[in-house]
Amino acid sequence: MPLLLLLLLLPSPLHPHPICEVSKVASHLEVNCDKRNLTALPPDLPKDTTILHLSENLLYTFSLATLMPYTRLTQLNLDRCELTKLQVDGTLPVLGTLDLSHNQLQSLPLLGQTLPALTVLDVSFNRLTSLPLGALRGLGELQELYLKGNELKTLPPGLLTPTPKLEKLSLANNNLTELPAGLLNGLENLDTLLLQENSLYTIPKGFFGSHLLPFAFLHGNPWLCNCEILYFRRWLQDNAENVYVWKQGVDVKAMTSNVASVQCDNSDKFPVYKYPGKGCPTLGDEGDTDLYDYYPEEDTEGDKVRATRTVVKFPTKAHTTPWGLFYSWSTASLDSQMPSSLHPTQESTKEQTTFPPRWTPNFTLHMESITFSKTPKSTTEPTPSPTTSEPVPEPAPNMTTLEPTPSPTTPEPTSEPAPSPTTPEPTSEPAPSPTTPEPTSEPAPSPTTPEPTPIPTIATSPTILVSATSLITPKSTFLTTTKPVSLLESTKKTIPELDQPPKLRGVLQGHLESSRNDPFLHPDFCCLLPLGFYVLGLFWLLFASVVLILLLSWVGHVKPQALDSGQGAALTTATQTTHLELQRGRQVTVPRAWLLFLRGSLPTFRSSLFLWVRPNGRVGPLVAGRRPSALSQGRGQDLLSTVSIRYSGHSL
């Protein structure tokens, strides 16, 4: 019998003690197998495990395929397991966190197909020396990547392109000497960047882009302060509150910013953000090394005028309307625009180009229009004057000629005053110089549809032919010159009359004439109308003031008289009799001796006597300190008129 009891107390071999600890928090089943000296995955794990800890074991090699039966697994910790190889086969569709830190991995396997839902990947403190270009392909949900404490020297461009949702990136404690310029491109959610304790000496231009980066750790690098560091210096100056020093075990939100921790290695630990940059190009110099924000470099040659060879064709007569400064410019190659013979109906290519207006001293011609359009048909063909190889200069005031340099790349034209327009020098090939027809037209109260023959123009140098309208004479005089002239701010847009049908022009002209004859639209009437309203308002204000003054003066004379006539009658006829009742059943006796001195008729009573009935039953006059009632306004006068009884706290 005792032996039987002993056998019952011994542990049953059918129910062995479990190797791992199992706990359940809410709906998550957590299995802890840490420090069990395991060399493989235990076989008796619950199938609904969501969190599995296998830290500090001796796994060496681990295959993710062994975890496929655990379809609800969301977190796997394999840190400090002496792993040298991780086999990725099978699929864990819901695994979100994988910790592989403090192992012996020399390469990072491709995890995209096996772990499509991975959000946190920690490969810190391994032996990684490089990363393949597609190491993170397929990890589109990744939010945190930790590569701290490896042996990385370079990173492939586009490494982080497959991870647009990345929020935290740790590359600290590596051997990085440089960073790809577009490493952070597309990472709109990135808020923490750890680059401390590397071998970085500079940051490429545009590296940070438009990222705010609330937490940046950049200390512990041998920053080389020279002209190439100016972009990084400017970024540090504008983000000084976002640069921190890493402290192990401290939350980044509890740290204090310290931009001075980023120091020059070649300037006796001088802070990079204070580097003066002496002798380096400044804003406007070549390179624009001090720019940032995507920090994109700006084009500083925007104010230079590029010399282009242009052929200009325009009608000899056009209807000009002041619609502002518009230019319809034809920019084409001289070789393509100069055939052996130009057809009169040749069309020009339209392209918008804007030239800054400039003032030309001693120049009385106003550049009214510059336009290029389709050549309209002509009804009257003006006969152009024949010209020779030398163009006949038109009589004109002094003009400023622009002589652009012959280089086709952004030369800057210089303005030289000349007493008169010069003639372009012909090239070795004989070419007809531009003619100067002077068609005379009516001052155009009613626009017609002239269709002059276009003048074939061939330029022999990079020049621009400009149509200038003179305002000296009422006639429209068009001067054609091969020298570019300065444009005034009062330039107007030219609309060819071909665009307006004759019927439409007649209707518009009729409306214009009727509007001129309308008396209500006359400018003098429009100016007199508000003046009339103003005078009418003044008269109305004056009339109202006089009426108000008369009313006030009448009220002042009438009111005192009414008061004087009514007050005497009220005083002579006012009589009052007061009946009092003692609510508490106590009579008040007035000694008759008080009225013995009266003889004859009774006088007019004008005063009152108040008797105070106290809570103890005593009756007496009003004592000092008590407020008189409204009936005692006339006390202290001749005789007694009425007797009022006052209880304690009441007035009758």
Swiss-Prot record:
Glycocalicin is the product of a proteolytic cleavage/shedding, catalyzed by ADAM17, which releases most of the extracellular domain. Binding sites for vWF and thrombin are in this part of the protein. The modification Phosphoserine is found at S629, S632. PROSITE patterns: LRR. Keywords: Bernard Soulier syndrome, Blood coagulation, Cell adhesion, Disease variant, Disulfide bond, Glycoprotein, Hemostasis, Leucine-rich repeat, Membrane, Phosphoprotein, Repeat, Signal, Sulfation, Transmembrane, Transmembrane helix, von Willebrand disease. Residues 17-47 form the LRRNT domain. Disulfide bonds join C20-C33, C225-C264, C227-C280. LRR repeats lie at residues 48-68, 72-93, 94-115, 117-137, 141-162, 165-186, 189-210. This is Platelet glycoprotein Ib alpha chain. Residues 553-652 are cytoplasmic. Residues 336-459 are annotated as: Disordered. Changing M255V: In VWDP; increased binding to vWF. The keyword Transmembrane helix applies.
